Amino acid sequence: MEWLNETFAGFDGGVFRAMHSLAEAAGGFLTPLTKLVTFIGEKGIVYFLAAIVLMLFPKTRRAGVCVFGAVGLGAILTSLTLKGIVGRERPFLANETFRAFWEFVGSPHEDGFCFPSGHVTSVTAAATALFVFFNKKWSGAGFFAVLLMAFSRVYLIAHYATDTLAGMLVGALSCAVAWGITKGIFCLLEKYPENKFCTFCLTFDVRALFRRAPKPPENGENE
């Protein structure tokens, strides 16, 4: 969308030029690292898997549900909604200078629109959910992953800097909505403790599947 490119041309262009200068100074060293970061965040698969693991334990189940919901909602808002509505082309397709930067850094071709960044939305949604439920000192480190992902997407000229900022906003909003839904779900489950399904959802612990059953006493052992 032209108005978006024109409005933030100075900011996005300045960030791209800084990234290109960094790429020239690094001599290609950062390209494989940023590609790896992008690969890890692809489709939000890592975050969904982490959420499933968290849901297997009673103490972390709420966090797992919130992470899963936040990342899922973020994907719906970005890939299935906002990208199509805004229709912003990838920077290497919209500007010859940015295309030259893209070719220099050796970034792979990416299809689809770019606003907001799906990668940044997903990692922000997951990091925010973890921050809400876990120790702030350690879970706060997840926001470093957000900055790293944003850096990698702009460095590879796959996104404008404004795409990544929008992704952060959408990710945080997705987490807020998912947190409210998670809270409602568990309030409902706790309201009906006599219901077997509710009890199962609240108390199931995957570790119980791997615990050895106590051996029956041998004949004469207790005599």
Regions found by a protein language model. Give the residues of each.
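N-terminal transmembrane-helix/juxtamembrane module of multi-pass inner/ER membrane proteins
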Residues: 1-48, 80-109, 198, 214-215, ...
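Membrane-helix interface segments
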Residues: 27-30, 59-64, 92, 134-141
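Loop-to-helix transition at the N-terminal end of transmembrane alpha-helices
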Residues: 36, 67-73, 165-168
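Hydrophobic alpha-helical transmembrane segments
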Residues: 38-57, 119-122
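Interfacial segments of alpha-helical transmembrane regions
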Residues: 50-78
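Membrane-water interface at transmembrane helix exits
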Residues: 54, 78, 82-87, 131, ...
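Alpha-helical transmembrane segments of multi-pass membrane proteins
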Residues: 71-83, 149, 153, 175
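Membrane-embedded catalytic cores of phosphoryl/pyrophosphoryl-handling enzymes
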Residues: 102-223
